[in-house]
Swiss-Prot record, chain A:
An annotated GO cellular component: extrinsic component of mitochondrial inner membrane
Subcellular compartments: Mitochondrion inner membrane
Binding site for Zn(2+): 205-206, 209, 221
Organism this protein belongs to: Scheffersomyces stipitis (strain ATCC 58785 / CBS 6054 / NBRC 10063 / NRRL Y-11545) (Yeast)
Alphabetical list of PANTHER family matching this protein: UBIQUINONE BIOSYNTHESIS PROTEIN, UBIQUINONE BIOSYNTHESIS PROTEIN COQ4 HOMOLOG, MITOCHONDRIAL
Keyword Glycoprotein carried by entry: no
Transit peptide start-stop: 1-31
Membrane topology: Peripheral membrane protein
EC number(s) reported in the record: 4.1.1.130
Pathway, per record: Cofactor biosynthesis; ubiquinone biosynthesis
Subunit description: Component of a multi-subunit COQ enzyme complex, composed of at least COQ3, COQ4, COQ5, COQ6, COQ7 and COQ9.
Record-given protein name: Ubiquinone biosynthesis protein COQ4, mitochondrial
Enzyme class: lyase
Reaction(s) catalysed by this chain's protein: a 4-hydroxy-3-methoxy-5-(all-trans-polyprenyl)benzoate + H(+) = a 2-methoxy-6-(all-trans-polyprenyl)phenol + CO2
Length: 320, 467
C-alpha cells in the first residue's frame, strides 16, 4: 500500500526534473524498497504485524478509535540524540534527500540524510551480522571506540614512520585538508547498536580513502564508494556509484569506467570486510602488510593520472 | 506355547501386557514378555526412585493419561511427585523472536495441555500394576533375555521369505505359529507375536513388513537441568533454531528437561562442552541471535572449556530488554545434572502395515517420529488401545486372535491417525529448520496469523492434547 503511494509521490516530486533524473529517483526508490522488502523478510513480517510498515493515515486510525492516539505518539528515543521516525517519514526523507543530493551535491546535509535514510535496518543488520561473526568486529561493538581528532592523537601519528597506517592516514588528512571531526552524528537510526555501527562506518570512511590513496575529489569519492559498496554493502555508496557519474565530464568517466570501477569491484569483493578493522589498534602497523592481509590492491594514483592527462592536453594544444 | 508373546519391555510392550491383563475379555490369555536388557532399575524405581531425574522424559497427552487411568490402570502407580502438568506451550522463532505462538490450554477450558513424565516412571508404574494384578502362570516377564531368532514353520521356501538373519530351518511344527528363539536357549511358540521391539524391530523384519522413511541427519540431545528457581508459569518452551528446535520442558520444582535437536556436528559439541558452560549455552540458545550462537559454537568447537563464552553470552543478553527477557523467555538455566546428557538419532519411519498373519507391531516398531511435538510414546499408547480393542472383539466373536481378520481392524483404526501425525511433524521440522528467506518470511507470517486465529489454535491445542 505504502509502496505505491511512495512511488506516486516520487512521481510528483520529479516531474520538474528531466527524465534522466526521474529514472534515478525511481530506480533508487525501487532499490530501497526492494531491499526493505526482501532482505530481512521476517523482521519485516513483525513490523508488518505491528503496523510499522503501514502508512498510518487518518483512515487507518479511524477504524481503531481507541488506539488512535497510540499511533500518533512518537516512540521514545533509543539513545542520546536519536530522533525516531516513522517508516513513511524515512521514505520521505530518502526521496527528499536524494533529489537534494543530486541537484545540490555540494550541500552536505543532503548527502548525510541520504546516507541515513538508505542505511535502512536490513542493511545495517547485515553489517551487524558481519561484525558479530568476527572476533574483532565483536570487540569493536563491545568497546564502541569513537574516532575524533583527540581520540586519535594526530600529533603522535605524524611522528610515526612513513610506511605505517597511522602516518598514511594523517598524511592523507593533511593533503586533503580534512579532520576526523568533520563527521556528523547519527540521529535517525532506531536501534542503538545499529546507530553505532553506522557511526562507525562513517568515521572509518577516511581510512578507506587513506589506504586506497584516493582523493576526495568527485572521481576519488565515487571510486571509494564503489569499493565500499562491494566490500560492505551500504546502499548509499551503491547509489552514489550509480548516479553520480552522470554529472562527470567524458574524460573523467573514461578514467572511472576503465580503471577505477574494475579496481573497486575487484578489491572490494576480494578483500576482507573493512568494517571489522580496529583502526585505532593497528595505526603503527605496516601499510603494505595490511593491504596484503586484507587483500586490497592499490589503485593507480588518481591525481597523477589527472596531471598526465592535463599535460597531454596542453602539449596537444601547443602543437596545434 | 503362548497365546501372546510380546517382544520388548519398553513403554509400549509393558503397556500392552498390563492392558491385556486388565481387560476382563483378554485377561485369560497366556502372555510372555521378553526384554533384552535388565528391568532391575525399573523395579527398583518402584520401591525407591533415585533423587535426581533420569534423562529420558516424555510429554504425555491428557488422552494417554486417561488411557492409563481407565484402561491400563497404571496411573495410580506413577510417582506423582515426579510428574509435572503444564498448560501452556510457547513456541518462537530464532530468526524473529516476535514470531511466536502460544498454546494456552486454560483458554479453551481444557486445564492441562500435557504432562511431563520420565520413561522409567511409566515403565515402573506398569510393573506396579502387573504386580497388583498378580503374576501367575499366564503372565511371564523374561528380562535379560534376547530374542535371537524368529522362525516360521511354514516358510520353507527361501526365495519367498525375507531372511534378515533368520534361520528358517530350525523350526519344525505343524502349526503356523511363529517360533521365538531366546538367548537362554529356550524357544516359545506364539499364537500371536507382538513386536514392541523399537525402531530396529526384529519382529517387523521377520514379518517382511516394509518400513519407509528417512534419517533426519539430526540428533536429539537430551539433558536434565535445574532452573534458577521454580517457574510457576508451567510453560513448555520451544525455540526453532536453524539447526533444529530447542525445547525446555518443566519438571517438578526447579527441575526441567531439554531436547535440543541439532546437526551431528552441533550435537557432538553439546555433549562435550564443559558441564558448567552447558547451562549458559542453553540460555544462549533460547534467547540470542543465530549469528551470536554460531560465533559461540565456533569458540567452543576450538575449546569446549573456553569460559570466555560466558562473557560473550552475558554481553549479548544485555542487549535484550530486561522486561521482555522476564516475560517472553524461560527462566535462566543454572545447572546441568551430572552425566545426564545423551543424544539420539532422529528419524521418520512408518511401516506400510502393522500386521501380518500372527504378527502385530506396536509403538516405535511401527513408527518413529521427530520429537518436536512430543508424540512418539503417545502414539504407542493409542496403538495399544486399538490393538486391545481388536483382540477383545475377536475373542467376543470366537475368532483366532492371530488371524488377520482380527488384526486388520487394529491397522484400520491406528494407521491413518499416526500417518497424519507423522506428516505434520515432518513438515513442521522441515519448515522450521530452514533459513531460506521466503520460507522464513512465510513462517513468520504464518506463525503470527496462527497465533491470532484463535479457532485454528483451539483445534491445534485439542490435537496436541489428544482431545
Ligand atoms: C529425544 C527424544 C525425545 C522424545 N520425546 C518424546 C515426548 O516428549 N513424548 C512422547 O510421547 N515421545 C517422545 N519420544 C519418543 C518415545 O521415547 C518413544 O516413542 C518410546 O520410548 C517408544 O517406546 P517403545 O516401547 O515403542 O520402544 P522402545 O522404548 O525402543 O522399546 C523397545 C524395547 O525392545 C527391546 N528389544 C529390542 N530388540 C529386542 C530383542 N531382539 N530381544 C529382546 N528385546 C528387544 C529393547 O531392549 C527395548 O527395551 C522421544 C524420543 C526421543 C529420541
Amino acid at each position: 500500500m505504502f509502496a505505491r503511494s511512495a512511488l506516486g509521490r516520487s512521481d510528483q516530486l520529479v516531474t520538474a526534473l528531466n527524465s534522466q533524473k526521474r529514472q534515478f529517483v525511481l530506480t533508487a526508490a525501487t532499490t530501497a524498497l526492494g531491499s526493505l522488502l526482501f532482505s530481512e523478510d521476517n523482521r519485516l513480517a513483525s513490523q508488518m504485524e505491528k503496523g510499522l510498515l503501514h502508512n498510518k493515515n487518518a483512515e487507518n486510525s479511524a477504524s481503531i478509535p481507541n488506539t488512535a492516539n497510540k499511533f500518533f505518539s512518537r516512540p521514545e528515543a533509543e539513545y542520546p540524540g536519536h530522533v525516531p521516525l516513522y517508516t513513511f517519514e524515512k521514505m520521505l526523507m530518502f526521496l527528499g534527500s536524494s533529489v537534494g543530493a543530486y541537484t545540490h551535491p555540494e550541500r552536505n546535509e543532503f548527502i548525510v540524510a541520504l546516507g541515513e535514510s538508505t542505511a535502512i535496518t536490513p542493511v545495517l543488520r547485515r553489517l551487524q551480522h558481519q561484525m558479530l561473526s568476527d572476533p574483532v568486529g565483536r570487540q569493536i561493538l563491545r568497546e564502541r571506540p569513537r574516532m575524533t581528532s583527540t581520540s586519535l592523537d594526530l600529533e603522535h601519528l605524524r611522528e610515526l614512520p612513513d610506511n605505517t597506517i597511522g602516518k598514511t592516514y594523517v598524511k592523507w588528512l593533511d593533503k586533503e585538508g580534512v579532520s576526523p571531526d568533520t563527521r556528523v552524528e547519527v540521529k535517525y537510526i532506531d536501534n542503538e547498536e545499529l546507530a553505532y555501527i553506522y557511526q562507525r562506518y562513517r568515521e572509518c570512511h577516511d581510512f578507506y580513502h587513506a589506504i586506497t590513496g584516493l582523493p576526495i575529489i568527485i572521481e576519488g569519492e565515487i571510486s571509494v564508494k564503489v569499493f565500499e559498496y562491494m566490500n560492505i554493502g551500504i546502499p548509499m555508496s551503491g547509489l552514489g556509484a550509480l548516479f553520480a557519474p552522470l554529472r562527470l565530464k567524458k574524460s573523467q568517466k573514461e578514467r572511472l569506467y576503465n580503471i577505477y570501477y574494475p579496481w573497486a569491484f575487484k578489491s572490494g569483493l576480494n578483500s576482507k570486510p573493512l568494517i571489522n578493522v580496529y583502526w585505532e589498534n593497528i595505526l603503527e602497523e605496516d601499510i603494505d602488510e595490511f593491504r596484503k592481509t586484507m587483500g586490497i590492491e592499490q589503485p593507480p594514483d588518481l591525481r597523477n593520472l589527472r596531471k598526465e592527462y592535463f599535460k597531454k592536453l596542453k602539449e596537444a594544444k601547443k602543437i596545434v | 506355547m503362548q497365546d501372546i508373546v510380546v517382544i520388548g519391555g519398553g513403554p509400549a510392550g509393558l503397556s500392552l501386557l498390563a492392558a491385556l491383563k486388565s481387560s476382563p475379555k483378554t485377561r485369560h490369555l497366556s502372555c510372555t514378555l521378553i526384554e533384552g536388557s535388565s528391568l532391575q532399575s525399573v523395579r527398583d524405581f518402584l520401591v525407591e526412585p533415585p533423587e535426581e531425574y533420569t534423562n529420558r522424559v516424555v510429554s504425555l497427552t491428557p488422552k494417554s493419561v486417561e488411557f492409563m487411568q481407565q484402561k491400563v490402570g497404571n496411573w495410580d502407580f506413577i510417582k506423582q511427585d515426579r510428574v509435572r502438568f503444564y498448560d501452556n506451550i510457547v513456541a518462537y522463532d530464532s530468526q524473529d523472536n516476535d514470531a511466536r505462538i502460544e498454546f494456552d490450554a486454560t483458554q479453551i477450558g481444557a486445564g492441562v495441555l500435557a504432562v511431563m513424565c520420565e520413561n522409567i516412571n511409566i515403565q515402573s508404574s506398569l510393573i506396579g500394576r502387573l504386580n497388583e494384578l498378580g503374576m501367575d502362570d499366564s503372565t511371564t516377564i523374561l528380562d535379560n533375555t534376547k530374542v535371537i531368532d524368529i522362525t516360521s514353520p511354514i516358510h520353507h521356501d527361501l526365495d519367498q521369505h525375507d531372511l534378515n538373519e533368520i534361520d528358517v530351518n530350525s523350526g519344525k511344527s505343524d502349526l503356523d505359529w511363529p517360533i521365538v528363539k531366546l538367548s537362554t536357549g529356550e524357544s516359545i511358540q506364539a499364537r500371536l507375536l507382538v513386536g514392541c521391539d523399537g525402531y530396529n524391530s526384529p519382529v517387523r523384519k521377520f514379518a517382511g513388513i516394509e518400513s519407509r522413511g528417512w534419517q533426519y541427519n539430526t540428533f536429539g540431545v537430551v539433558a536434565t537441568i535445574k532452573m534458577q528457581y521454580e517457574d510457576h508459569r508451567s510453560i513448555g518452551w520451544q525455540r526453532f533454531l536453524s539447526t533444529g528446535p530447542l525445547a525446555i520442558l518443566p519438571l517438578s520444582e526447579d527441575n526441567a528437561t531439554i531436547v535440543w535437536s541439532s546437526t551431528p556436528w552441533l550435537s557432538e559439541l553439546l555433549l562435550k562442552v564443559n558441564p558448567d558452560i552447558f547451562p549458559h549455552l542453553i540460555n544462549a540458545g533460547m534467547t540470542l541471535e543465530e549469528v551470536d550462537l554460531k560465533y559461540i559454537y565456533s569458540m567452543l568447537d576450538k575449546d569446549p572449556n573456553d569460559f570466555k563464552v560466558l562473557d560473550e553470552i552475558q554481553w549479548r543478553l544485555s542487549k535484550i530488554d530486561i522486561k521482555s527477557l522476564e516475560e517472553n523467555y524461560p527462566l535462566p538455566v543454572v545447572e546441568l545434572i551430572q552425566n545426564s546428557r545423551a543424544r539420539f538419532p532422529l528419524k521418520l519411519s512408518h511401516a506400510d502395515t502393522y500386521v501380518a498373519p500372527r504378527v502385530a507391531l506396536v509403538g516405535d516398531a511401527a513408527h518413529t517420529i521427530h520429537p518436536l511435538a512430543g508424540q512418539g510414546l503417545n502414539m504407542g499408547q493409542s496403538d495399544v488401545g486399538f490393538l486391545v480393542d481388536a483382540l477383545e472383539k475377536g475373542i467376543e466373536r470366537g475368532l483366532d486372535i492371530g488371524s488377520t481378520m482380527v488384526l486388520d481392524s487394529y491397522v484400520a483404526n491406528a494407521w491413518p491417525g499416526n500417518h497424519m501425525m507423522l506428516g505434520v511433524c515432518d513438515k513442521l521440522h522441515k519448515v522450521f529448520t530452514t533459513d531460506f528467506g521466503p520460507v522464513v518470511l512465510l513462517r513468520g507470517l504464518g506463525i503470527k496469523s496462527l497465533n491470532m486465529a484463535e479457532s485454528v489454535k483451539d483445534l491445534m491445542i485439542k490435537a496436541i492434547s489428544g482431545r
